[in-house]
Structure formats: C-alpha cells, structure tokens
C-alpha cells in the first residue's frame, strides 16, 4: 500500500509523526506498506527547521509543492493544481490529510477527484461558526473523506449527525498524546527556562495562530488584557512563543501597555 501524507503547516508535522513512525515500523516488520510525506509549502520555509524533524525523529518531506501565499483562495487553487500533478506521477492508494487548513481542503478535493481513498485526521472538529474559513474547510474535508479519525466521542457524534457512515468513523483519541508518550524519556528542561530565570510551573505559555486574531489588533489586545486580569498572580511571567507577523503584532500591543515586564516573546523552541 502506497500512502501519501499531506501537511500544510508546522503543527501538522507534529500530528502526523506518530503515523509516520507506525508506518515505518510496519514496513520494517515486512508489511507491504510505504509512505511519502508531501509538504504544500516551500523547502526553505523557516518554520520547519531541521531541529523539528530531529525532535520528532522523522525524515524531512519527500516532496514540496512550493506554494506560499497569503490569499487563501489563491493558495487553494495552487495546491490543487500542483498536488494533482504529484498524484499523476506518484501512484497512491490512500491520501492522509490532517486538520483544517485551506491546503488540506485543496488536497482532499484533488484526492477525491482522482478517485483515491481519503483519510482525515482530527475529523469531526467543529466551531459551529460558518463565518470562519477553517469551519468551511472542515465541512468539506469530512464530507469527502472515506475514513474519519476522530479525537473523541463528541467528534464521532458530529461526524455521524452529518451523515458519515458508522463504519467510516474511528475514534483514535488525541494523536498528540502519542508524541508525548513517545518522547517522554527524551524530554528535557527547556534551556529557555534558565535563560529567562523561570521556575517550573510558575509561568504561563502564550501562543497565537489564528489569522483572524492577528489581523484584528484591537480584539487581540482585549483578549491579552483579559488574560492578564484573570491571572491569580499579576507578576507571573508570560512566555509568548511566537514568530513572524504574530510576534510583531503582539510585541506592538505589549509595548503600548504595562505588560512588557511580564510578557516575554521568544522563538518557538
């Protein structure tokens, strides 16, 4: 069986790592199974540094579609055309997609149009806000998928209510937990704790990945202020693990408030 695993962002690699390791193990045991890892972005994407793959103990992608643009509709079209070419030149039995990105939806559409079996990891996730682009992506991907892997009973119920056949839905739990279990013995105290003089369990980790929030600084500022007001200890350090535009937006907000003394922006570790 030839499996193609499609990822569209850094976080996707973390979710597919356990699957890649399971496929590799099955292959070593003599089973007729192999995989190709396809990244929809560029090879020089700064968010997927070598240390990411070292930490996850998986290889870098086998193929890069090279798509990089901010307009989601344009991105969708480019991924569709380039992924179609990939499938035409690489025999594939099953395509696995993860989460709810525009690139994920694009790959899902092409897969079904090519008559290839489609599996979706993190299926049945809903915000019930159809104005969110990702909610549209989720509905499309789940609607097209032949196999839906869900994280819990509530996700199963959503998939079933939306018409998914029972024999297509598999509750496999939160796949991120597999990574924690796999890496538990290798986990070390992050060097950044010592660098910033932090004590264990006495700091807050803050991250941000919603484009809608990044683009609405006024709303984001309200959320950050609400977070600080809700803290039991107003002096507790907040570690913001951010890069790129998200880091700049948060830095600008912090600079205009009284938070600089407690909020520290660092590169994702």
Model regions and ranges:
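Active-site and donor-binding regions of nucleotide-sugar-utilizing enzymes
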Residues: 4-7, 14-22, 28, 52, ...
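A short, Lys/Arg-enriched amphipathic alpha-helix followed by its capping loop at the start of a domain
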Residues: 19-33, 229-234
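Short internal beta-strands
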Residues: 35-42, 237-243
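Generic beta-sheet signal
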Residues: 38, 121, 151, 172, ...
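N-terminal beta-loop-helix "entrance" segment that forms/cooperates
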Residues: 42-59
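A nucleotide-sugar donor-handling region in carbohydrate enzymes
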Residues: 43, 47, 66, 144-219
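Donor-nucleotide binding loops and adjacent catalytic segments primarily
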Residues: 50, 188-269
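Short, conserved active-site loop motifs that form the nucleotide-linked donor/cofactor pocket
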Residues: 62, 169, 262-264
